[in-house]
């Protein structure tokens, strides 16, 4: 069998990985202006950006490709590529101007060493670079934020100014004993005078600047910056409240000011990556007087403000603050001229049948409005799928654009003048690029999709969704009658299922989910002959707010039992080899994997844990998300929390370290030394405990890697070591 050959020959697995890892993924798309041909036809260009792993350069490369879409205003007549792909090097951000005649690009260039790189803001027009500004040399601010949390690059409606977010310029600092700074002739009076803005402050060279945690380590104090394209002048906007950090900004109607999200950073910052619950609000700062106005509830959390095409309305997502990191959100509408805020879509406690289960997305697409400024289009997890939806902002009615179609998952890249650009994939189909027009209100389910880039299905992979109902003794008393799901991938060419080993993968979060989309590792393992079980235990997103709220206070118990129940059900129904079952999980998935080999040591023959949570007690004082430790253990979080014996006992009771004496499963640990979310000392603590008890354990420590272990060199090495570990402990 092919499975046995690949398991016994690592080079075969490496060749398979090299092939499948070449599958690119879409990262962005934008639509050019509408053009009328000399014969009266209409067409638009679609500019797409992709990423792909390059194993020879050991990096993720970015490239772009353009397509032409001919249409009649309501449907696509013809579509196809307009040339080959071109690699884009150094681009951090790019944005088309409102008219489509110009494009702004933030680019890094310069030294080979990371710290020597410079940032340039370029303005392109037609076939030439119109302007280029060396932001690093101008020294108005620090590095520009290119992330999707704070970062933005926004054209003014007049197309004369650019708005972006950058790190606040830090004062120069030096030692008291730096010779060139000493001035022995200065009098006491001169020493007491205020320092000049550009004069170095003595003794401040080691002052601590608190950052925003995982993947945001260089980002501390963001400021809003405006570039005047004609004059080249850069101004840092004033009026932003001192207690918030601004981001996700755009120009207000008429360019009278700037709308932005402000995140509270007092009394200190918590990690913001993957955390939609950070206290924040929507603000407007007037450019003429510098007055700042609060536009939303300041006690909650907001993100993704998006201005309608008619410049009359702003929609945004709103979440409870200091609760589970990710949960069902509300969609709000702010009328710019009446100043009235209205709720469009509320939190959904439970999904009723096949109905809408709520909004579960961390960001709305930059382009999400219909042409008439009445409907908003977005993608959201719905159980174990991700679908596209249109919501009428006047009535609040939500309609699926993809229900009843192919059972994969969709992602909206953009919509402009009702032309949608979307990505579609399944567990055995890499991402495809599709376009289609948003139908009139009431006919949303009749979208006609046209493929611009069609991926080839990966053969010999069969997949499906399993609906699971916990047994009566595992019901949650407060949130009863909740079900959950698992996605099962299995080789379709296996003549004898009893010889098929299985890898069980619980997701991280815990409030995230697996969806029926393309994922490299599960597809790879399935091609090698493994069945792969992806478990969306109770607490996963997409199943209603009640499911999410059922887990805090029950981690290490409810989620563990759900995964074990899913494993037992699938083994019973599919008759896979129960002697060869392995676990593989990262973060909270690693937490569950280590729990399972301690609570059910007879079930699992191998375990791979990536940056796992091991001891919630010791994690509390070292992670960038101490609120996670409290909330998921079942306690409210407050910034002034001090250790409490009862709380610490509960944390320990819910930690995998408690079950160390029962563990006998061989464990492969993979840790990122720069992980701020689950510091690598967590895995090291587990490693020492296993070594002391003679349990087979191997530790891989990646020096420059972060929580996701997603760098190309790290990802490829971790996969090959996973294959070797499975081969050693499951056999072929």
Swiss-Prot record:
One of its GO terms (biological process) is proteolysis. One of its GO terms (cellular component) is nuclear membrane. The keyword NADP does not apply. The modification Phosphoserine is found at residues 185, 187. Its EC number is 3.4.19.1. GO terms for molecular function: identical protein binding; omega peptidase activity; serine-type endopeptidase activity. It catalyses: Cleavage of an N-acetyl or N-formyl amino acid from the N-terminus of a polypeptide. This is Acylamino-acid-releasing enzyme. It comes from Mus musculus. The lineage of its organism: Eukaryota, Metazoa, Chordata, Craniata, Vertebrata.
